[in-house]
């Protein structure tokens, strides 16, 4: 049965396509917007996003378009699913067609370098008459497209936003959990990209399972430490948007950031690796932004510092690993034993 609320997804990448397909499959009139008119026409004709989500059949009722007015003007729920570097531009292009009372959510896991803004900050600045939120979690788009069992988190201060997103996106293979800590959910999605690169490096160097476990756990500690300084709830990082997203992106070759790290560990050039991906690996830019912000705040983030040295200062990987292993040993769980009291 067709539902009354209309859904729009801005961004024809892999994750945006997967979410739009779910919404259409749940009976919501859904429009998937992308800049490229030819690609929109091709997807409408073939019923497939051959570039970003090949092999996944699109719902026959899903409308693909490059017309922003058609996509936004009559929508009730707008999901923005574009890379962070173009997020602000897309929202500013779209807001002229926005109407009061619409729900706008970001699915983008990145940080805007202009003032260290998260995507919800941009939505809040640009859309003053709309309710906002974010979606984040352990969501590899290819697996979702193939209908593998998965879950995500919708975070918003608005209960109607959370409820509608759960209704629109929940299905037999995809669950949607709710949270009010929008900042924490969003930070988790952005920060884990850094550590996925590190995990890929470790895998390429064949450092072992103990090493991987250590890296993931210390990554979670580092993320939580930074999040507290930024005003997020550390408990959020124990959920799907924190440890859940961290584990999947640090373990799967389907993760773009993991693949970047793996290639670096094999001695490939960063520029060649990023170009070969065909999609954005947010962790490369996020590493620089978080390293600078952590220094500004006085937050210790040794893994971020180490990766920054490898990517931007071209330190030998083995030298950075050696430096990290020789650091002063501190507390394991800092919210139990503060760093200042550790041996």
Curated annotation (Swiss-Prot):
It is found in: Cytoplasm. GO terms for cellular component: cytosol. It comes from the Bacteria. Pathway: Membrane lipid metabolism; glycerophospholipid metabolism. Its EC number is 1.1.1.94. The active site is at 192 (proton acceptor). The keyword Lipid biosynthesis applies. NADPH binds at residues 14-15, 35, 109, 141, 256, 280, 282. It catalyses: sn-glycerol 3-phosphate + NAD(+) = dihydroxyacetone phosphate + NADH + H(+); sn-glycerol 3-phosphate + NADP(+) = dihydroxyacetone phosphate + NADPH + H(+). InterPro entries: 6-PGluconate_DH-like_C_sf (IPR008927), 6PGD_dom2 (IPR013328), G3P_DH_NAD-dep (IPR006168), G3P_DH_NAD-dep_C (IPR006109), G3P_DH_NAD-dep_N (IPR011128), NAD(P)-bd_dom_sf (IPR036291). GO terms for biological process: carbohydrate metabolic process; glycerol-3-phosphate biosynthetic process; glycerol-3-phosphate catabolic process; glycerophospholipid biosynthetic process. Catalyzes the reduction of the glycolytic intermediate dihydroxyacetone phosphate (DHAP) to sn-glycerol 3-phosphate (G3P), the key precursor for phospholipid synthesis. This is Glycerol-3-phosphate dehydrogenase [NAD(P)+]. It comes from Hahella chejuensis (strain KCTC 2396). The lineage of its organism: Bacteria, Pseudomonadati, Pseudomonadota, Gammaproteobacteria, Oceanospirillales.
């Amino acid at each position: 049965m067709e539902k009354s609320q209309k859904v729009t997804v801005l961004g024809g990448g892999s994750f945006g396509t997967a979410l739009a397909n779910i919404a259409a499959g749940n009976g919501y009139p859904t429009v998937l917007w992308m800049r490229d008119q030819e690609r929109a026409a091709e997807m409408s004709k073939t019923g497939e996003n051959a570039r970003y989500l090949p092999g996944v059949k699109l719902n026959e009722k899903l409308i693909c378009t490059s017309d922003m007015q058609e996509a936004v003007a009559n929508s009730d729920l707008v999901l923005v699913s574009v890379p962070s570097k173009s997020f602000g531009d897309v929202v500013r292009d779209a807001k002229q067609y926005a109407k009061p009372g619409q729900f706008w959510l970001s699915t983008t896991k990145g940080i805007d370098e202009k003032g260290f803004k998260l995507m919800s900050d941009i939505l809040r600045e640009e859309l003053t008459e709309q309710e906002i939120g974010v979606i984040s979690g352990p969501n590899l788009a290819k697996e979702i497209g193939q209908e593998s069992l998965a879950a995500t988190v919708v975070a918003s201060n608005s209960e109607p936003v959370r409820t509608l997103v759960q209704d629109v996106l929940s299905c037999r293979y995809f669950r949607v959990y709710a949270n009010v800590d929008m900042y924490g959910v969003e930070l988790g999605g952005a920060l884990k990209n850094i550590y996925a690169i590190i995990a890929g490096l470790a895998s390429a160097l064949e450092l072992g399972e103990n090493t991987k476990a250590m890296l993931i756990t210390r990554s979670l500690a580092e993320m939580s430490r930074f999040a507290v300084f930024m005003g997020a709830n550390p408990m959020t990082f124990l959920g799907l948007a924190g440890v859940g997203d961290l584990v999947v992106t640090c373990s799967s070759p389907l993760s773009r950031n993991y693949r970047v790290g793996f290639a670096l560990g094999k001695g490939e050039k960063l520029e060649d690796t990023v170009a070969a991906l065909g999609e954005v690996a947010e962790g490369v830019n996020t590493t620089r932004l978080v390293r600078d912000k952590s220094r500004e705040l006085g937050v210790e983030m040794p893994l971020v510092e180490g990766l920054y040295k490898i990517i931007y200062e071209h330190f030998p990987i083995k030298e950075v690993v050696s430096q990290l292993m020789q650091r002063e040993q501190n507390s394991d769980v800092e919210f139990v034993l503060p760093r200042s009291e550790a041996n």
